[in-house]
């Protein structure tokens, strides 16, 4: 968030513009009313207030901080001078010149003397009148000529509002440019966003070899191959349901005799599995675990 103080510092760097002069002329005119003279003396009509301010600014070479500080004194005079008071044709010119003299002497170590300010008026005021204007303004302000930052912010709020918006947009643009990805990061991001190809030539998916493909076959297919080459075998007479081999046992001697009888039966009825040129496997083949084809991990977006 842009503060008023930052906007004020930015405003003080600007050169004096016609908008500033017109603002001061309007502020001075709102302090006191002028009673029109129906019979003005020829050659004594003062110049327009905005033209008078412009001529003084050009001849004195006053800068923006000193010039716009007069708005603080103008606001203070607005609360001091009564509303029902009327001035002469040069009253507003006198008020502005007195406020500018006070601002120049308060804010600068070295400022023009009153005789110099008299020449800046181009003959409108004399040196004695300029001295009187300065003393009267000091009495109106009770010799309180301090200019604080809150006073400037309050008096120049008309100019600070647009500057704050401009600074906000400028800093936002700078943040966007600062956080923008570099060309290398942008290229890496685009490459990571490309879809993975599933062609045979793509290296994103590992293709199993012909040897390992045999392990992917199902149990049913392997069983069908065994059934093709293995002949039907005779049943062994000594199965688990043979009553001759499974008689009730009475003691430990019977258990030992039963085990010996079973060994003799298996030795006699052993099946010879060597048959011609087509060997038959004596045990069921082991089905290996299926291969899990997984894509390579997607790269995450680049981090700022």
Swiss-Prot record:
The membrane spanning regions, by residue number, are none
Indicate the segments forming the Cyclin N-terminal domain, all copies.
Answer: 19-146
Superkingdom to which the source organism belongs: Eukaryota
CDD domains for this protein = CYCLIN_ScPCL1-like
Q: Which GO terms describe its molecular function?
A: cyclin-dependent protein serine/threonine kinase regulator activity; protein kinase binding
- Short name of one Pfam family: Cyclin_N
Gene Ontology, cellular component aspect: cellular bud neck; cyclin-dependent protein kinase holoenzyme complex; incipient cellular bud site; nucleus
GO annotations under biological process?
cell division; G1/S transition of mitotic cell cycle; regulation of cell cycle; regulation of DNA-templated transcription; regulation of establishment or maintenance of cell polarity; regulation of transcription by RNA polymerase II
**Induction statement:** By transcription factor SWI5 in a cell cycle-regulated manner. Peaks in late M, early G1 phase (at protein level).
Which family does the entry's similarity section mention? Belongs to the cyclin family. PCL1,2 subfamily.
The entry's function note states: M/G1-specific cyclin partner of the cyclin-dependent kinase (CDK) PHO85. May have a role in bud site selection in G1 phase.
Name under which the protein is recorded: PHO85 cyclin-9
């Amino acid at each position: 968030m842009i503060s008023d103080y930052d906007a004020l510092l930015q405003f003080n760097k600007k050169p004096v513009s016609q908008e500033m002069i017109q603002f001061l002329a309007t502020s001075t005119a709102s302090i006191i009313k002028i009673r029109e003279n129906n019979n003005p003396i020829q050659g004594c009509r003062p110049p327009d207030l905005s033209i008078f301010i412009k001529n003084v600014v050009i001849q004195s070479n006053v800068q923006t901080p000193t010039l716009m500080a007069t708005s603080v004194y103008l606001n203070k005079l607005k609360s001091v001078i009564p509303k029902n008071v009327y001035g002469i044709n040069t009253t507003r010119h006198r008020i502005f010149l007195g406020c500018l003299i006070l601002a120049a002497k308060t804010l600068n170590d070295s400022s023009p003397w009153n005789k110099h300010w008299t020449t800046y008026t181009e003959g409108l005021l004399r040196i004695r009148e300029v001295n009187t204007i300065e003393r009267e303004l000091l009495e109106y302000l009770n010799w309180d000529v301090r200019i604080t930052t809150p006073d400037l912010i309050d008096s120049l709020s008309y100019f600070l509002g647009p500057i704050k918006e401009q600074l906000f947009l400028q800093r936002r643009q700078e943040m966007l440019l600062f956080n923008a990805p570099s060309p290398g990061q942008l290229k890496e991001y685009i490459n990571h966003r490309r879809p993975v190809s599933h062609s045979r030539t793509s290296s994103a998916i590992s293709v199993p070899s012909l040897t390992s493909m045999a392990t992917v076959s199902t149990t049913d297919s392997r069983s069908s191959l065994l059934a093709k080459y293995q002949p039907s075998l005779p049943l062994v007479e000594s199965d688990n349901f043979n009553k001759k081999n499974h008689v009730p046992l009475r003691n430990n001697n019977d258990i030992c005799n039963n085990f010996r009888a079973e060994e003799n039966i298996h030795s006699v009825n052993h099946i010879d599995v060597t048959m011609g040129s087509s060997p038959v496997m004596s045990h069921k083949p082991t089905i290996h675990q299926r291969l899990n084809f997984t894509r390579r991990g997607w790269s995450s977006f680049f981090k700022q």
